[in-house]
Amino acid sequence: MRKRAFIFGSAWLVAASLPLVLMAVGQPQEHAVTLRIMPVGDSITRGTYLGGETLPNPLGGGWRKRLQDRLRAAGVPFEFVGELDYWAYGADGVVDPSFSPRHHGLAGFSNEGILKGGVVPTPKAVLAAKGVQEVRVPGIVEALARNKPDVVLLMSGANGFDASARDRLVETICAHFDGELVVATITPQKAPRRGWELVVPYNASLPGLVERHQKEGRRIRLVDMYAALTPDDITKDGVHPNAAGLDKIADAWFRALVPEKPRPRVGAIR
């Protein structure tokens, strides 16, 4: 894995072993290095096809499209990476040429599934467009090695709520990845989603897991995505975010990637 040790403690993203990775937001970027971001998760990461199997769909890129819009507006050079490449579509049905389509959002997969890989449930229109019978992805270790991300955005567990498998997934990523891991609690769920009441206890153990890895020197941080959304931000299926929810997810990831500059205290010497 490449040594591009990005640090997200201020408005700067710095890489050891490179002269300059990314100038502060809004500054010239003549020597900026493109940040390789790998979104890892389930159908919420992939982007739900709310129109069933009919493509194109305006929400095809989910929160990934929205996050990319924010990063681009902030002047952050980036590339999304992952084993899948479902595109985002504009309202007029034309592929958005600025969209970076790759991701590792494995629809229907549990934490264990993401860890091990397998056949990904894929809309028929996507299979037809690709001319394949199925889409298969490797386990997370091989996926990391193949895609070489600088940052992993992990939000998983909505399928199965298996905290022990999540812990193994996080441990595996930390053991095979020297970049920055940003892990999120899962978003709220509601009826008629089966098991929606398990979301809170599943999320409750995540801060402790992150803290333990931080104390061990791992480069891992937490985003509280559950607190960022409300049940009103979830569609009638009880699990997938609606347009407002997707915006909030993108905002939360953006704040994690591009922290605000510290504001001077009133009366402080400038």
Feature map (PLM): residue ranges:
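A cross-domain feature marking catalytic cores of carbohydrate-active enzymes
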Residues: 156, 185-186, 224
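Histidine-centered active-site loop/cap adjacent to the catalytic His
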Residues: 37-40, 234-270
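N-terminal secretory targeting modules
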Residues: 1-85, 137, 145, 214-219, ...
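Solvent-exposed, polar/charged alpha-helical surfaces in well-ordered, non-transmembrane soluble domains
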Residues: 65, 69, 138, 142, ...
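Conserved SGNH/GDSL esterase-like catalytic core that processes O-acyl groups on lipids
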Residues: 38, 44-167
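Substrate-gating cap/lid alpha-helix
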Residues: 179, 188-223, 243-247
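Active-site cleft segment of glycoside hydrolase catalytic domains centered on the general acid/base Glu
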Residues: 161-172, 192-202, 235-241
